[in-house]
Swiss-Prot record:
GO molecular function: N-acyltransferase activity
Family assignment from sequence similarity: Belongs to the transferase hexapeptide repeat family. LpxD subfamily.
GO cellular component: membrane
Catalytic site: H242
Primary gene name: lpxD
Assembly: Homotrimer.
GO biological process, one term: lipid A biosynthetic process
Enzyme class: transferase
EC number(s) on file: 2.3.1.191
Protein name per UniProt: UDP-3-O-acylglucosamine N-acyltransferase
Domain of life: Bacteria
Pathway the protein acts in: Bacterial outer membrane biogenesis; LPS lipid A biosynthesis
Amino acid sequence: MMSTLSYTLGQLAAHVGAEVRGDADLPIQGLATLQEAGPAQLSFLANPQYRKYLPESRAGAVLLTAADADGFAGTALVVANPYLAYASLSHLFDRKPKAAAGIHPTAIVAADAEVDPSASVGAYAVIESGARIGAGVSIGAHCVIGARSVIGEGGWLAPRVTLYHDVTIGARVSIQSGAVIGGEGFGFANEKGVWQKIAQIGGVTIGDDVEIGANTTIDRGALSDTLIGNGVKLDNQIMIAHNVQIGDHTAMAACVGISGSAKIGRHCMLAGGVGLVGHIEICDNVFVTGMTMVTRSITEPGSYSSGTAMQPAAEWKKSAARIRQLDDMARRLQQLEKRLAAVTSSGDASSDA
């Protein structure tokens, strides 16, 4: 049976530096949206489009800015950034199991591997020769940690994560199930129509405070390491090819695909389904909208798009038909321009006469 987590509103306020407007002793047992929250739950208003739900919300208390709290009759925690406060408080109510320190009897650990006594190694995990596991690391069941790979302190690997050999991971990195780090990059040389494999002799280096989603893959470098900077956040099912470099605090949504040797700057955001060709560079502070195909380097910060926005199917079919006619339309336009130029030239000559 699951025990109930409970905090007073005053305790939550102290955790995020909020001003309490209402009963500081009110018990809060969870978090929920404005529409779904009950009297024992805390909610938040971060997006103006949800403001319409605030007056009717049954939440015991709501995280609000000072401006929103002034017109609110209920109990509130007043903060500068409600969404950031919610993010901080969410960890207090996280029921993710915490593994006890130690190595499960079914795990296989190489004799020369180093596992900190405070680390946890789950059932049927494999830790190969020369690997080093830092303090407080949690390795889930059926994980594989390849030879000479390193996991920094406080790391968390869900079940079935695979690290190939020579992967270096910084502190406090979280990796979800199915992720594969350090697989061989897609490198081949063509000889008379036959593909000859290129050994991928680099590794992967990942910084601190990185999050890697389920079934995301990061290939090892062909020569030097594939590099993932500090604070990078990667969603599920992302493909990062060999020798890619990703700058600090860049975030990517699901199904992004990055071709080999691309370099992405710091504080960038790539929305779902974005694709990058290889050997290009993206500068810092770039936002790329969903389904965009980036085919050349981006040298100026800002927002970039190439995807086609949704429209009713009948309209889209008409637009697609027009696109197929563009070459013909361009030729006809050029002919009209030539005729117009000839008429204009003839008229000018007559005027001069």
